[in-house]
UniProtKB/Swiss-Prot annotation:
The gene is miaA. Pfam families: IPPT (PF01715). This is tRNA dimethylallyltransferase. It catalyses: adenosine(37) in tRNA + dimethylallyl diphosphate = N(6)-dimethylallyladenosine(37) in tRNA + diphosphate. Residues 35-38 are annotated as: Interaction with substrate tRNA. ATP binds at residues 11-18. Its cofactor is Mg(2+). Catalyzes the transfer of a dimethylallyl group onto the adenine at position 37 in tRNAs that read codons beginning with uridine, leading to the formation of N6-(dimethylallyl)adenosine (i(6)A). GO terms for molecular function: ATP binding; tRNA dimethylallyltransferase activity. Monomer. Its EC number is 2.5.1.75.
Length: 300
């Protein structure tokens, strides 16, 4: 197995990514989750988190590590993933990124976008800090969150000081990391999984039915009872957000909610495949028919 290789295994929701991992040999690789909802504690069933059995077979990172009220974005993912890659390489273990968030895969391999957009709320917040606490406070804050940037700009360059803090508060990543060049990961084995769309539709219907059988309704009631609502970042996931309609319209039939989850899931699959098809140098497989070829590619 080639040293310093990184493996991507991606594909749409319900394609069967987790099933392949049960066939991995123990102790050689660890999985880094590339999903924006499985990161949250308590949101278990509709997010289709890897099972206890799978996580005992192969270690998973970036699962169940955030509170539901915390924001998760590309910046947090990139920062955490970069640390995990280094740690696994130090242990001579293979990093295997598995999930369906194409945007995260793209920027992990090709680097972060050159300075990301910042919301008007963040700009207002930084401006209020400048107005109420002054330039010296902003300088100390920049020194704390991005010492490299702090050392590289003039203490009188208030525009760049403010911009640097805006980017950090928006993404959780120092602007100095965005400005660096040559961060592309070269040695990536990108494996894509796909099935015919009718097969995907059937699998989604089955998966949503299994969610209900496994207690999704009870999980939703428990989450709402704890005060989580439409402002909770974790509730943006498919399978959760649809039940917010049920909360606001209790006369809605459960079957209508289930149908909406199936519809939204299938539309999401189509969007995922549109994005994945644009990623170059991907080796595409059917997860059932080509399992042996996939394992040979990864571990030989």
């Amino acid at each position: 197995m080639k040293k310093n290789k990184i493996v991507f295994i991606f594909g749409p929701t319900a394609v069967g990514k987790s099933d392949i991992l049960f066939n991995f040999p123990k102790g050689i690789a660890e999985v880094i989750n590339v999903d924006s909802i499985q990161v949250y504690k308590e949101f278990d069933i509709a997010s289709c988190k890897p099972s206890v059995e799978l996580r005992s077979h192969i270690k998973h990172h970036l699962v169940d590590f955030l509170e539901p009220i915390e924001e998760y974005n590309l910046g947090v993912f990139y920062k955490e993933a970069s640390k995990i890659i280094k740690n696994l390489r130090d242990q001579d273990k293979l990093p295997v990124f598995v999930g369906g968030s194409a945007f995260y895969f793209k920027h992990l391999q090709y680097g972060l976008p050159s300075t990301p957009p910042v919301s008007s709320e963040i700009r207002f917040y930084v401006n209020s800090l400048f107005t109420t606490r002054g330039k010296d406070y902003l300088l100390e804050e920049l020194k704390r969150v991005d010492f490299e940037r702090y050392e590289s700009i003039s203490e009188n360059d208030i525009y760049r000081i403010r911009r640097s803090l805006e980017v950090y508060y928006q993404t959780g990543i120092p602007i100095s990391q965005f400005l660096k060049k040559g961060q592309m990961i070269e040695d990536v084995l990108a494996i894509g999984l796909k099935r015919p769309m009718e097969e995907m539709r059937s699998r989604i219907i089955s998966r949503v039915g299994n969610m209900i059988d496994c207690g999704l309704l009870e999980e939703i009631k428990s989450l709402l009872g704890k005060g989580y609502d439409e402002t909770t970042p974790a509730f943006k996931g498919i399978g959760y957000r649809e039940f917010l309609l049920w909360k606001s319209r209790p006369y809605s039939m459960l079957n209508d909610i289930i149908d909406l989850i199936v519809k939204n899931s299938f539309l999401y699959v189509k969007r995922q495949m549109t994005f994945f098809d644009k990623i170059p140098n991907v080796l595409w497989f059917h997860p059932d028919d080509d399992l042996r070829d996939i394992l040979d590619l990864i571990f030989v």
